[in-house]
Amino acid sequence: KAGYALSGFLFRLLLVFDRRHHTRSVQHLLHAGIAKDKAQARRLTVASYLEFSKLLVEIVKMDQLYDPAKIRVVGSQAAIDISLSQEHDNKPVIIATAHYGNWEVAGTAYAEKSRIPMTSFMRPFSNPLIGKMILDHRAGDMHKLVDKREGIRPILRAISQNRITTMLIDQHAGANEGITCEFFGHPACVHMTPALLHLK
């Protein structure tokens, strides 16, 4: 609780001084139609920043608080049976997911629950100090992290080793990395990599 309080205070300060991201968040919420007006968009922006502050604390404290026995996988029983099976018909599994919940801890938790090693592909953090702090606490023997700038070879290597391959695909892709489709009623460039790997 003390960690949440301290990080919440620091992130509120960040929100005050980081006007560029504050303004961009409000604009995106309004553009997507999630917020009905600027006042609601600002409230959602503050709430989002505070959730990020909690996530950072949870990652830093993961070594002390993480308990595999408390992890459970939810969803349809058929999906659970398939996802937690070690067989998978000898086919590699590709997970395309988004930034929701504590996605940093979720990769490790899922790999340990399924007992199948996972490789997650990520883009580098804009702040290298925060990035190092997060990476030092979230990677383990069952969960390997790979910088997406390394290209396609690490992905193919992970697939050939029957590791679970995970990609976060809810961020705007570059013009040479994605294809345009509708997202929240607006055109967005989405990543093609998971679909191309599946077809391969």
Regions found by a protein language model. Give the residues of each.
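Membrane-anchoring hydrophobic helices of lipid-metabolizing enzymes
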Residues: 1-97, 102, 131-136, 142
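Short Gly/charged-rich anion-binding patches and loops
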Residues: 24, 105, 133, 153, ...
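Membrane-associated lipid acylation/remodeling enzymes share a hydrophobic transmembrane-juxtamembrane segment
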Residues: 117, 150-200
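A generic structural signal for well-ordered alpha-helical segments
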Residues: 86, 111, 138, 158, ...
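Residue-level detector of family-conserved "landmark" positions at structurally sensitive sites
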Residues: 39-40, 121, 148, 191
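Catalytic core of membrane glycerolipid acyltransferases/transacylases, capturing the structured
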Residues: 89-149, 172-184
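Active-site metal-coordination segments of metallo-dependent hydrolases
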Residues: 23-24, 124-128, 187-191
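Short, structured secondary-structure boundary patches
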Residues: 59-61, 139-143, 166-171, 188
